[in-house]
A protein has these predicted regions:
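Tryptophan-anchored aromatic micro-motifs
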Residues: 21-42
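Short, solvent-exposed mixed-charge patches
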Residues: 21, 141-143
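Short beta-strand segments that buttress and anchor functional surface loops
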Residues: 61, 93-100, 109, 120-124
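N-terminal glycine/threonine-rich, aromatic-flanked beta-hairpin/loop signature
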Residues: 48-76
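Short, exposed beta-strand-loop hairpins at the edges of beta-sheets
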Residues: 108-133
Length: 143
C-alpha cells in the first residue's frame, strides 16, 4: 500500500502536465513535409520550413515565413490526450482556416507523438485526396 500511493501521485502529476499542454499556445516548426494521398501513400517530400501555431482558440499555419503564404482561423473543437508531454499522445483539432483570397477550408489537424517522433497531419475537407504530414523539429510554448 505504501508503494501504491506514491505511484498514483506520480501518475496524476504526469496526467495533469499532459492536460496542461493543451491549454498552452505552442509553436511547432517543421523542415520536412510529406504530401500524402487518401491512402496515406507519399506522393512527394518537401524540405521547407512550416510553422504551426496552435492555441485553444486559433491555428496559424505558415510556409517559409512568408506572410502571404499562410492559413489561419478559429478552432471549432479540440481533443487532447497525452500520456507523456510532447512525446506520447495525440491532439486532434477541427478548425475553419482561411488562406489567400479568403478561401475558407474546414480542416482537421492531428498532432501526434509516438516512437520518438512527433508530426502534424493537416487535412482539408475540400481536398480529400491530399494530406500534409509535417515532421516536428522543435516546439516552443508561448506566453
Amino acid at each position: 500500500m505504501k508503494k501504491i500511493i506514491p505511484l498514483l501521485c506520480i501518475g496524476c502529476a504526469f496526467t495533469a502536465a499532459a492536460i496542461a499542454q493543451c491549454d498552452k499556445k505552442v509553436l511547432y516548426t517543421s523542415s520536412k513535409e510529406e504530401w500524402l494521398n487518401s491512402k496515406d501513400e507519399v506522393q512527394k517530400t518537401d524540405q521547407d520550413k512550416v510553422t504551426v501555431e496552435i492555441s485553444k482558440t486559433s491555428v496559424v499555419i505558415n510556409h517559409n515565413d512568408d506572410p502571404n503564404d499562410e492559413m489561419k482561423g478559429d478552432v471549432k473543437a479540440i481533443d487532447c490526450n497525452w500520456t507523456e508531454l510532447y512525446k506520447i499522445g495525440k491532439t486532434t483539432i477541427q478548425a475553419q482556416l482561411t488562406e489567400g483570397n479568403n478561401d475558407v477550408h474546414d480542416a482537421s489537424l492531428t498532432i501526434e507523438g509516438k516512437d520518438g517522433v512527433m508530426f502534424i497531419l493537416i487535412e482539408l475537407k475540400d481536398h480529400p485526396d491530399t494530406k500534409i504530414k509535417a515532421y516536428v523539429d522543435k516546439y516552443e510554448e508561448e506566453g
